[in-house]
Structure formats: C-alpha cells, structure tokens
Amino acid sequence: MSRPVRAALLLVVFIAACGGSATAKDPLADRVEHLEEHGFEAREVEPRGDPLPEAMAVVQLDGAEATIYAFATGDEAQRAASAFAAEEQAAPERVRVQREGTNVYVGRAPAGDELPAVDFEDVVFTSEELH
C-alpha cells in the first residue's frame, strides 16, 4: 500500500472514530434540507432554551412559524414539551406543540392571528418522514 493511500485510509478511520460526518453532529441538517426540497423556507438558528437543545430550526408558515427543537434525550424533549404545553394551553388557537421522539415542534402565530394548523402538521410530517 502506497504512502498516500495509507494516509487517506487512516484519515477515513480517524474521521469515523471522531463521530463521522458533519450531519451526524447536526441532527437537523437533513430535516432542514428535506423541508426545503418540499418547498418550505427553513433555516437553522442558534439553539437556546432550558433545556438547551442540540439544534434548532425555524420554518416559515403563512403568517406564522414552526420551530424544531432537537434534544439529546427523550427526557429533555419531554421536559421541553411540557414547558411549551403551558404556552399552548394559554393560546390554543395561536400555539401548537408536538413531540416526536427527541424532537419537539412548536408552531406559533403572532398575537391576534391563528396558527395555520394544516401547514404546521405538514412541517411535522415532512420532517419526520425521513426517519
């Protein structure tokens, strides 16, 4: 085996040992790309919140938006979904929360508007159909 081939092989083994591809470290990259392929305007944003998600993405809806929170564990996702549920109960026509595994989807419309529920469900379905 030549030296360049051996170096390339070692690099591949090293990358795999360090966690694999970039998308393995970014749990929403594939979902955002898939949503965009289906006509949604989606982008990743800086994660924030308590518990802190591993990644976050925002999807534009007709006069509203859906936020996808990707958590490391199901327990963190459940804790976040429970916290968002209070917001949903206070304004059920404006806010919708749905948990799928370690992901939490939150649809929000501005005050005085109504969340386009079908659009929100389309975001969840399109995002989840990959997995």
Task: State each model region's role.
Residues R48-P53, Q78-R96:
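An anionic, turn-rich surface loop/hairpin at beta-sheet edges
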